[in-house]
Amino acid sequence: MVEKRIQPLARDAMAYVLAGGRGSRLKELTDRRAKPAVYFGGKARIIDFALSNALNSGIRRIGVATQYKAHSLIRHMQRGWNFFRPERNESFDILPASQRVSETQWYEGTADAVYQNIDIIEDYGVEYMVILAGDHVYKMDYEYMLQQHVDSGADVTIGCLEVPRMEATGFGVMHVNEKDEIFAFIEKPADPPGIPDKPDFALASMGIYVFHTKFLLDALRRDAADPTSSRDFGKDIIPYIVKNGKAVAHRFAKSCVRSDFEHEPYWRDVGTIDAYWQANIDLTAIVPELDIYDKSWPIWTYAEITPPAKFVHDDDDRRGSATSSVVSGDCIISGASLNKSLLFTGVRANSFSKLEGAVILPNVKIGRRAQLKNVVIDHGVVIPEGLVVGEDPDLDAKRFRRTESGICLITQPMIDKLDI
């Protein structure tokens, strides 16, 4: 990695987080909340990763654009991200879609979500803009990307993942030269172009962009005046710059934050039930791919005051126990057994129940003798006594949202419809 400058560029940057997406592939999990507000890792929300990256990178001016079912997200940020102080030249603004440009126009795309708040951005008076997606899980020091942007003289610098070439068909892919200068941006190509130094890999867009502020605002105004534009960074703004300006790729491996226990760059789009379940369950491994215990790069979130977790009963057939599991505060495991499971705060698991491969969101109550395998249980669900999930695929599919790989999403309306 390059050495950091004495005066970090991040101190003259604003992070603008796009957090208005629904995340429809998460199905009922986003019926009541936007995807960035979905719980992750036993304590945090997904958006906390982008926000923590900005804060840990030294960025002290942050704006978050919200739109779809934003109440849960806004409440979380008001509780957990209220420590910025204007007297220290810090600011944290929540920017809901509010028809600032037109009385009939909400945010129409990712670029429009920035354009409609141009006056607020200008008031910040920053030199650089870091545009972030609020729905990915990763650890990254944006200072390195800012440095590359300045050193290369680029109009836009795009954060990119190195992925196996034929796995890149679902991404926007960069066609680059030996200097990582982008000369083509291809959306979801059938035959992705390889990287010059790694022909079996492709550079896929992470949805992270760095601009000089003036250049970005000029580009947004030009795009807003184009009646054919869809007002989207990936579809409109970036292709225009690639064609008419200078775009440079920043490889995630250069700025990925890794502890001594993390060997590979970690980035996940937990946009499906399977991916969400897997990323949470991965945290129960002895040495997980994502180290959320790294104190040098903390994942900031709302620090809810809770009592410690408690395990009770020690009879041969009724023992509160957990193996290879993550159990958060205010959980009571009362004669239940857990294996390879992740529990958020306030979960109650009652006697003789068994959980394996379970991701349990806050304040769930699990009745006696329930047997739950490979499940995601939504916030506040009450699991009835004796419910069995994970043994009969056909029955599970009739009752719950079951994926092809066998993961069951369980919500309270699904439970209310059961005839048991």
From Swiss-Prot:
One of its GO terms (biological process) is glycogen biosynthetic process. Disulfide bonds: none annotated. Pfam families: Hexapep_GlmU, NTP_transferase. InterPro entries: ADP-Glc_PPase, ADP_Glu_pyroP_CS, GlgC_bac, GlmU/GlgC-like_hexapep, NTP_transferase_dom, Nucleotide-diphossugar_trans, Trimer_LpxA-like_sf. Keywords: ATP-binding, Carbohydrate metabolism, Glycogen biosynthesis, Glycogen metabolism, Nucleotide-binding, Nucleotidyltransferase, Transferase. SUPFAM superfamilies: Nucleotide-diphospho-sugar transferases, Trimeric LpxA-like enzymes. One of its GO terms (molecular function) is ATP binding. The keyword ATP-binding applies. Alpha-D-glucose 1-phosphate binds at Y107, G172, E187, K188, S205. Its EC number is 2.7.7.27. It catalyses: alpha-D-glucose 1-phosphate + ATP + H(+) = ADP-alpha-D-glucose + diphosphate. The keyword ATP-binding applies. Pathway: Glycan biosynthesis; glycogen biosynthesis. Involved in the biosynthesis of ADP-glucose, a building block required for the elongation reactions to produce glycogen. Catalyzes the reaction between ATP and alpha-D-glucose 1-phosphate (G1P) to produce pyrophosphate and ADP-Glc. Homotetramer. Belongs to the bacterial/plant glucose-1-phosphate adenylyltransferase family. This is Glucose-1-phosphate adenylyltransferase. The gene is glgC.
